[in-house]
């Protein structure tokens, strides 16, 4: 409905341009907001106040001109001017009930699909040769939620798991395997079962032995030169590491597959060409033997030029080089309209620089939108990045296991008579959902405190609260299984029915905001408010004990649409629902 109001205002603007009341070349930014106080209508805009200067009239005069220019529309009951020049729209009640009935019969809940775009989404992207840790959680689940929402809207989404599968760490691992095989023969292969321990042991050797470090660097050169033995081992490391990653993805309910992996190594053959192309355009400079690009808009605090390093003095390449190659591929081969990067906010400057350079060098099409969807850190209760008690990195699998264990204790305390098998199934869903929702419900740009106690609470904006809210709504239909709703329709007569109906009608609008800004917390907040609106409705409006059959069926339809919206919303967040808790 919000987009419908915007469309009506756009038509009014065109009429005012034709009447020469406002300049034909004026680009009006139309903002429509939902009102908090329904006595002021359902939607409001400050458009008249924005046009005052160009129309050379006072805001209320402009507001009246806009209203007079609005096309007749059956979905709008009336339009009023308020205060200094706000325009308030009152939606026709029949239009709202028609919208709700349409959503009820539609798999997409009445979400009008926009013009489909090709959207490349770079997310998760862990460094291989180590197990995933808590630092990988945010990119993985925020990116996946946005991917699901984009696909729900009808866009073509190309997932890109830009894993760190190349670099000096592999020389270190190759050297350690070589050393172990000299000592243990083929038994050395067993050590790879615990890749994290293998990596730590290799790092100790690298730090303590200059001879080992020299050999590691030599093996990197051999790997990059295509040495068959080195490449075979490298593929083994990657395969084992990716297997660990996909076990985590499966537990998290994340949609990434092996087919979505396109790591740094995929761009190895393009890196020299990136250097040549930048050089041919006169963009490269030399600084201490390295090849760099200086851009006027990027400077240090002292006003010194801040370079993008393209190639080190020893000939090695950096993240910027492979990122530029990846951007060119995503623009010119994948033909992306948008490229979204779900990467830590601490990389903001890096992305500002490479996005700017990619455009300067014409590596990407002008119409491609490059967007860094940065996020804050997940911190412990001391406000510092989340660590183990000994100060080590927390493995993601360990975090998920602890969440499931704590959820099992919680569910068992609520259902002491439930059999262990069902308890375990419910605990798995609740545990994983709690970890994901606790993260997704926070503004992605903010740091947040990780707390098992808060995330497993049945009160507040948490996964257990929403999962329980869904089972409560779904439970109504178990008691009303024999009621035939064929031919029934929604009627909004009680204030709480209207509040619930208005909240249900906002689903498409919230989804649009989540997709445009890459902010799953908008959807989380909406689902929490929807659950609250249903709770208020259920307390004030008897459903199965309604005064009439028509009223009972209308309220059952509202409950049905609420259940459908909660289930779909949680699914878009990658959260499984339960029929019983």
Curated annotation (Swiss-Prot):
Highest rank taxon of the organism: Bacteria
Any one biological process term the GO annotation gives: arginyl-tRNA aminoacylation
Major site of localization recorded for this protein: cytoplasm
Chain location of the short sequence motif 'HIGH' region per the record: 126-136
EC number: 6.1.1.19
Keyword Cell cycle carried by entry: no
Subunit structure: Monomer.
Family designation: Belongs to the class-I aminoacyl-tRNA synthetase family.
Name this protein carries in UniProt: Arginine--tRNA ligase
Record lineage: Bacteria, Pseudomonadati, Pseudomonadota, Gammaproteobacteria, Alteromonadales
Gene (UniProt): argS
């Amino acid at each position: 409905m919000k987009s419908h109001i915007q469309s009506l205002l756009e038509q009014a603007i065109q009429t005012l341009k034709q009447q020469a009341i406002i300049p034909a070349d004026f680009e009006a930014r139309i903002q429509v907001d939902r009102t908090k106080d329904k006595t002021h209508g359902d939607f409001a805009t400050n458009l008249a106040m924005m046009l005052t200067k160009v129309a050379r009239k006072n805001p209320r005069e402009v507001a009246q001109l806009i209203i007079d220019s609005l096309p007749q529309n059956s979905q709008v009951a009336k339009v009023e001017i308020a205060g200094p020049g706000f325009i308030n729209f009152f939606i026709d009640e029949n239009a709202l009930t028609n919208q709700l009935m349409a959503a009820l019969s539609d798999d997409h809940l009445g979400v009008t699909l926009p013009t489909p775009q090709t959207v490349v989404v770079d997310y998760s992207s862990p460094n291989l040769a180590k197990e995933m840790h808590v630092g990988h959680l945010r990119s993985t689940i925020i990116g996946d939620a946005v991917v699901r929402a984009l696909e729900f809207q009808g866009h073509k989404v190309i997932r890109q798991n830009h894993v760190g599968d190349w670099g000096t760490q592999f020389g270190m691992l190759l050297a350690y395997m070589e050393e172990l095989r000299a000592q243990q023969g083929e038994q050395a292969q067993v050590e790879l079962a615990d890749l994290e321990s293998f990596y730590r042991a290799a790092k100790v050797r690298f730090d303590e032995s200059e001879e080992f470090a020299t050999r590691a660097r030599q093996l990197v050169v051999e790997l990059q030169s295509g040495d068959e033995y080195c490449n075979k081992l490298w593929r083994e490391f990657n395969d084992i590491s990716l297997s660990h990653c996909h076990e985590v993805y499966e537990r998290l309910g994340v949609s990434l597959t092996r087919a979505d992996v396109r790591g740094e190594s995929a761009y190895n053959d393009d890196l020299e060409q990136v250097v040549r192309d930048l050089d041919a355009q006169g963009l490269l400079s030399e600084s201490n033997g390295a090849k760099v690009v200086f851009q006027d808009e990027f400077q240090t605090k002292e006003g010194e030029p801040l370079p993008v390093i393209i190639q080190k003095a020893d000939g090695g390449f950096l993240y910027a080089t492979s990122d530029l190659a990846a951007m060119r591929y995503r623009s010119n081969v994948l033909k992306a309209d948008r490229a979204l990067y779900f990467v830590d906010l601490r990389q903001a400057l890096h992305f500002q620089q490479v996005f700017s350079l990619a455009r300067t060098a014409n590596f990407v099409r002008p119409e491609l939108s490059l967007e860094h969807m940065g996020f804050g850190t997940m911190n412990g209760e001391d406000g510092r990045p989340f660590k183990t008690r000994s100060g080590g990195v927390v493995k993601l699998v360990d975090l998920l296991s602890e969440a499931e264990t704590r959820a099992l204790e919680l569910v068992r305390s609520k259902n002491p008579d439930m059999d262990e098998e069902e308890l375990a199934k419910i605990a798995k869903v609740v545990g994983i959902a709690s970890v994901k929702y606790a993260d997704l419900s926070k503004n992605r740009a903010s740091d947040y405190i990780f707390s098992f106690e808060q995330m497993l609470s049945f009160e507040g904006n948490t996964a257990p609260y929403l999962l329980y809210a869904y089972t409560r709504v779904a439970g109504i239909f178990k008691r009303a299984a024999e009621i035939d709703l064929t031919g029934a329709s929604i009627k909004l007569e009680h204030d709480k029915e209207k509040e619930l109906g208005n909240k249900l009608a906002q689903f498409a609008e919230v989804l649009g905001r989540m997709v445009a800004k890459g902010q799953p917390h908008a959807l989380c907040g909406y689902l929490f408010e929807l659950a609250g609106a249903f709770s208020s409705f259920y307390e004030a409006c008897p459903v199965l004990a309604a005064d009439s059959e028509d009223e009972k069926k209308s309220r059952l339809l509202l409950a049905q649409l609420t259940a459908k919206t909660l289930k779909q919303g949680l699914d878009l967040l990658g959260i499984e629902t339960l029929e019983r808790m």
